Design a protein with these regions (language model features):
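Membrane-interface catalytic loops of GT-C/OST-like multi-pass glycosylation enzymes that act
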Residues: 20-25, 191-206, 327-333
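Membrane-interface transmembrane helices that cradle and orient dolichyl/undecaprenyl
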Residues: 35-52, 56-60, 217-220
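Short periplasmic/luminal acceptor-recognition loop of GT-C membrane glycosyltransferases, typified by
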Residues: 282-295, 303-432
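Short acidic/glycine- and proline-prone juxtamembrane loop motifs at membrane-interface regions
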Residues: 14-28, 65-66
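Transmembrane-helix signature of polytopic, membrane-embedded enzymes
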Residues: 1-11, 29
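Transmembrane-lumen/periplasm boundary regions of multi-pass, lipid-linked membrane glycan transferases
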Residues: 55-56, 61-200, 208-211, 215, ...
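Extended, compositionally biased regions that are outside compact catalytic cores
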Residues: 1, 22-25, 147-148
Length: 439
């Protein structure tokens, strides 16, 4: 059962989408899984497991927001109440809540000790933001959930629903009630969230959903298990075929339509130059996948988790192959290195002094400013009180094309931009940006 649940977790389509980026959803998923594991551990070690669950709840607040942490905490408390195990229920609940409060409380405590002057104002703003999050759910998030949950939670969700159906007359049994507690907590959090994406809250349900799916898989007949196996073979074989076809088109320039679609995703990498070791690794993985497919088609497996194994192997092979073959495309599509490089060159012509001068960038979000600073020696700030000699702002390429304008003296529009983006960067001396219409 543990093997099947782990393989279902690896094979989920949704979690692989953002795992290549340094985003908070990865930490949020890890702490949600830790909270679920703590509740499972509490069945045999009631207070150590409850303490781990409480720590994970507090850490979820620190890495995400108060609503996500409260949602995970509600799931833990519901599991303590509904699932019978050793230890006093009240003490387990108290342990979980206390450890969660202590874990979260370390943040404001250290902040007030080290920066007490500004900590009060900061946490007032933080509290206002958390209040804005709580409300009635956004109907647009329901549309997102209806459109995406089928592939986002594939292939686990059909087997999870089957497990609930098979044990529908005895939902209080441990292996059903415990994961269902977290799923119900997610539903409560989704209803009470007005400004949190449904995708963000779905991380709370991934681990319990995989556990439910493993029990549902065990309850399936042989033909249903074979459907998952053949589905995995067909889907990932087609996907790998597409990956290699696009790589060949990117390398040889044929077929032209496929080649053009790849060029649209990248600003600088017009010619494939994947490293030979990456290509060799992708070829080895392709041979490994074909071996798994042939072996499955030639033999009838006796292990009931063969379907999740094929699905997990397929998505792993597919993702590593895509990264190996299209690493330059992925980098150039997501990076700000080329923008930062050109901005640094233009500022040098404007006599920018590193370490002394700064660039006012009020229209650029914090993540964008941080990425540009990382790839250059430019100091960007959004503070109005800063005395900067230079300014950078966003302009629309479509608007400039429809309404040609003459820029104020000293201003330039950077030629570098992110692929398929309408945003361009206007750089020049600080002061009012005067734009005159061309006659």
């Amino acid at each position: 059962m543990a093997d099947a649940a782990t393989l279902f977790f690896i094979s989920l389509f949704g979690i692989v989408v953002k795992q290549h980026e340094a985003v908070f959803e990865t930490a949020e998923l890890a702490f949600s899984c830790a909270a679920f594991f703590g509740c499972c551990w509490a069945l045999t070690r009631p207070y150590w497991g409850s303490a781990l669950a409480g720590f994970a709840c507090g850490a979820s607040i620190l890495c995400s927001n108060l609503l996500v942490g409260a949602t995970v905490l509600v799931g833990c408390l519901m599991s303590h109440i509904l699932v019978r195990g050793i230890g006093d229920t009240a003490r387990k609940i108290f342990t979980t809540v206390a450890v969660a409060f202590i874990t979260f409380g370390l943040w404001p405590l250290v902040a007030y000790l080290l920066a007490g002057v500004v900590a009060g104002d900061y946490f007032n703003l933080w509290a206002q933001r958390q209040i804005q999050i709580v409300g009635f759910f956004d109907p647009q998030e329901i549309l997102w959930f209806v459109k995406h949950f089928i592939w986002y939670l594939c292939p686990a969700w059909p087997f999870a629903f089957w497990a609930i159906w098979m044990w529908r007359k005895n939902l209080t049994i441990t292996h059903i009630a415990l994961p269902l507690s977290f799923c119900c907590a997610w539903l409560i959090g989704f209803i009470l969230s007005s400004d949190v994406a449904a995708e963000t809250l779905l991380s709370v349900t991934i681990a319990p959903l995989c556990v439910l799916a493993s029990f549902g898989l065990m309850a399936c007949n042989r033909s249903t298990k074979s459907m998952l196996e053949l589905f995995s073979v067909a889907i990932f074989t087609l996907a790998l075929t597409g990956v290699w076809a696009y790589f060949i088109a990117w390398t040889l320039g044929f077929p032209p339509k496929m080649h053009w679609s790849i060029l649209r995703l990248t600003a600088d990498e017009s010619v494939s130059h994947a490293h030979w070791t990456a290509i060799l690794l992708a070829l080895v993985l392709l041979v490994f996948w074909l071996y798994l497919c042939v072996r499955r088609l030639m033999r009838r497996p006796i292990r009931f988790w063969t379907g999740p194994w094929l699905s997990a192997s397929g998505i792993t092979v597919l993702w590593i192959s895509a990264v190996c073959l299209f690493g330059p495309v992925i980098d150039s599509n997501r990076t700000y290195a080329n923008i930062a490089r050109e901005m640094s060159q233009e500022l040098k012509t404007m006599h920018y002094v590193p370490g002394v001068d700064c660039v006012l960038a009020q229209t650029l979000p914090l993540s964008e400013r941080g990425a540009i600073e990382w790839h250059s020696n430019i100091s960007l700030t959004a503070s109005e009180s800063a005395s900067c000699r230079f300014v950078v702002t966003h302009v629309s390429a479509k608007a400039q094309a429809k309404n040609p304008t003459k820029m104020a003296p000293g201003f330039v529009v950077l030629k570098s931009f992110r692929p398929r983006s309408d945003t361009r960067y206007l750089l020049g001396p600080a002061g009012p940006v005067l734009i005159e219409k061309q006659l």
